[in-house]
Amino acid sequence: MRKIIVGSRKSKLALTQTNWFIDQLKALGLPYEFEVKEIVTKGDVILDVTLSKVGGKGLFVKEIEHALLTKEIDMAVHSMKDMPAVLPEGLMIGCTPKRVDPRDAFISKNGASFKELAEGAILGTSSLRRSAQLLAARPDLQVKWIRGNIDTRLRKLKEEDYDAIILATAGLQRMGWDNEVITEHLDETLCVPAVGQGALAIECREDDKDLLQLLAHMNDGVTEKTVAAERVFLHKLEGGCQVPIAGYATLTENDAIELTALVGSMDGSVLLKETVVGTDPEKVGLEAADRLIKQGAKELILAANKGQQ
């Protein structure tokens, strides 16, 4: 019986996701056993500055990918939105399980909705994507950076001078906390989700054919297709955490991919948004990027990167 070593970050959410996925594999009843190896990533250690200032994408995966390449672990369970658009040579996404709710969750201190927040209220987020879109809708709000895992952020909302914070619905759902803490879900038209938000990425070595066969049982075709379109868009625009960038795709009734893509200025005064429909994930992602580039997306990205230096 083969023992599969599964790499995971140490946070409660990461371990919950990893153990959930292992349980799905165990339920297949195949001759494998599993062991979790906890790995500390740079993103877990640097908590005093915003993600965008310390290098953005890859902050939560580099050390785990190193462990994959050196064969310390066999596979890793990541949040898809933490994955860089390009993976190191020799590694691949072995499967994409079914995506859960991709929306952003709005959590306020006193139960007020986003629209009901008082003028000048303080909104906590560490995401340029969220802050740009929410400032576009409510320029009167103040954004204050907030870092830390889910528990830490919920505690800061209670104890510090935040009126509301934004978290991913998916993480709260996986922790079983969604019903008790979420004030409202932000509609995708108000706040387009991050590329891959709500999906998991199971990363492994390309040459591990045995493991790839096992992972194939857990792949969700719709999630794979839609997330692929989002990631092609992200790659073409070379966007990471340093840029207000968003992409969310769904499958229409006719099995076409519908991708809504967005790039914004840091303060939300400019939001470029396009929706592209097609059957091929790569073509849809590239088309969305090309349309936004024609509108000036590259200039916005350049300005955002300069603003982070």
From Swiss-Prot:
Q: What class of enzyme is it?
A: transferase
Q: Which GO terms describe its biological process?
A: protoporphyrinogen IX biosynthetic process
Gene3D superfamilies for the chain: Periplasmic binding protein-like II (3.40.190.10), Porphobilinogen deaminase, C-terminal domain (3.30.160.40)
Q: Name one GO molecular function term.
A: hydroxymethylbilane synthase activity
Does this UniProt record's set of keywords contain 4Fe-4S? no
Q: Show the catalytic activity.
A: 4 porphobilinogen + H2O = hydroxymethylbilane + 4 NH4(+)
Q: Name one GO cellular component term.
A: cytoplasm
One Pfam family linked to the record = Porphobil_deam
Q: How is the cofactor bound?
A: Binds 1 dipyrromethane group covalently.
Job of this protein: Tetrapolymerization of the monopyrrole PBG into the hydroxymethylbilane pre-uroporphyrinogen in several discrete steps.
Q: What is this protein called?
A: Porphobilinogen deaminase
Gene name in the database record = hemC
